[in-house]
Design a protein with these regions (language model features):
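Active-site microenvironment for binding and transforming phosphate-containing groups
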Residues: 1-132
Length: 132
């Protein structure tokens, strides 16, 4: 791992889960990171810390995995906000009325949205990436 990225290992109820965060982020009052796939409850082939509803995993497993992450952050799962990413250009500001969009299912996520941002505290923003 290079010096510009730090890895954080967190002991969770289903094993250790990890995320990487850029080292410069420590200068700001935010938490940012990319999670690894271990330490969650999803079964193969999604094992185990799958955070996405749209890939065919059991919805309850995704909810539990998301709860593992936000518990570490000290935030309620119902504040998770995300969009249905479509490889487009649309970015959406998460305002109070959008907090919780996509928290518990793909059907409530913001449509046709590839980026989200906010200035609200305690609102975890989820984006999904793949190794394709």
């Amino acid at each position: 791992m290079n010096q510009s990225v730090k890895r954080i290992d967190v002991k969770g109820p289903h094993g250790t889960w990890s995320y990487e965060s850029p080292s410069w982020i420590d200068r700001f009052p935010i938490v940012m990171g990319d999670t690894y796939r271990h330490g969650g409850v999803s079964k193969a082939p999604y094992e185990s810390l799958n955070l996405a509803f749209h890939v065919g995993d059991e919805a309850q497993s995704v909810r539990e995995n998301r709860a593992i992450i936000v518990k570490y952050l000290g935030v309620e799962p119902n504040r998770i906000s995300c969009g249905n990413q479509v490889h487009g250009l649309k970015a959406v500001e998460i305002t109070e009325d959008l907090v919780g969009a996509g928290a518990f299912g793909e059907d409530t996520a913001i449509d046709d949205c590839d980026a989200v941002f906010t200035n609200l505290p305690h609102v975890p923003l989820f984006l999904f990436t793949a190794d394709c």
